Structure formats: C-alpha cells, structure tokens
Regions:
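Feature for soluble, non-membrane regions of globular proteins
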Residues: 1-199
C-alpha cells in the first residue's frame, strides 16, 4: 500500500515551547512529507510495492537504498509523532517502569542512557529504547535506520537529525534531548509499543 502522511495527533503549536510550531511545520509538513513522496516513487516496480511498511523496512535494508532510506524514515517519523504529547514526560506506566528497572537499574538511568545515545550519535540519526532478547537497552542508529533491521523492536525513539531541533535549540542537541525526555515523551504510547513487542 502507498505511504501516506499521518496527521499529527495534536495541533502544530501543542508542544510549544519545548518544540515550536515552526519546527513541526517544517519537520512534519515538509520533511516527513518528502519521505512519503520519495518513498512512493522509489517503491514503484519493486518487490516491496504494496507490502506493509515494517516488511518494506526490513526487506529493503542493504538492498535498495532509495526504498530503505525513505521507508525507514517514514516508519520512524510515524511513531515519533505518537511518542510525544503535550505536557508529556512524568510517571512511567507500571509494566514499562518494571522493564526499565530490569534493563537499566532505574528509570532515571534509562533516561540518562537514552539521552547519551542521542548525544553521541555522530551526525544524523536516532536514539532508541530497544527491546532485544527480552531486555531493554538504549541504542542509536545512523540516518534512517532503526532497531528493526538490527534484530530489535523500538519502544521509544527520538530523532537527532538537525531538522528536529535546530530551529528551537540551534546546536544544543543535549538540551533538546533532555527536554524531550522530561517534557514530551508519551509514556502511554511507549507502553503500547512495549506490550506489542513482548507478545
């Protein structure tokens, strides 16, 4: 099925001042839309045309850069918008809290490790809380890659491409990541992704 741009689950100004209307207008309305359009063009006539998104991401990795880069970024961003909410952050739901404590020792350590993964990702990419072999860990990937292509399941991801933070934070990526973790994360959606991942 063709890629389509999902609507934001909140108004463009709902995450301000942590993430501005201008950032979301560029990031969602222009960058994500470009991945959708370029992905649809790249898919034409390939073996992945009409396949589910996750299957396209896994199948095209290492085989077709044009398909993979756009499919990967479409997948990542489709979840990224849902991983945020107005007045996010706060308490983690029970099952996720237990999993974070099992994987990291504490919820605070999980947050610190996620931030560190994002800070140390050289150039464009993503930082993740990843479920692999029954355990949660903080990981990072370059460009449009995600844990799916490395045998893991993403339960939370944060975009560290400059277009995700440069309007609001300029070169202060660590400040953006801290603000994301403390004020934007939609832990209910993280819990939903975790429940699906452990099935």
């Amino acid at each position: 099925m063709a890629f389509t741009l999902p609507e934001l689950p909140y108004p463009h100004d709902a995450l301000a001042p942590i993430m501005s209307r201008e950032t979301l207008e560029f990031h969602h309305d222009k960058h994500h839309l470009a991945y959708v359009n370029n992905g649809n063009n790249a898919l034409k006539g390939t073996e992945w045309e009409g396949k589910p998104l996750e299957e396209i991401v896994k199948g095209s990795f290492g085989k077709n850069a044009a398909v993979f880069n756009n499919a990967g970024q479409h997948y990542n961003h489709t979840h990224f918008w849902k991983w945020m909410k107005p007045k996010g952050g706060g308490k983690t739901p029970g099952e996720v809290e237990k999993a974070l404590k099992d994987g990291f020792g504490s919820v605070d350590k999980a947050k610190e490790d996620l931030i560190q993964a994002g800070v140390t990702q050289f150039g464009s990419g993503w930082a993740w809380l990843t479920l692999k072999d029954g355990k949660l860990s903080a990981t990072k990937t370059a460009n449009g890659e995600n844990p799916l292509v490395h045998g893991g399941k993403p339960i939370l991801g944060v975009d560290v491409w400059e277009h995700s933070y440069y309007i609001d934070y300029r070169n202060r990526r660590p400040d953006y990541l801290k603000a994301f973790v403390e004020n934007l994360v939609n832990w209910d959606y993280v819990a939903e992704r975790y429940a699906a991942a452990v099935k």
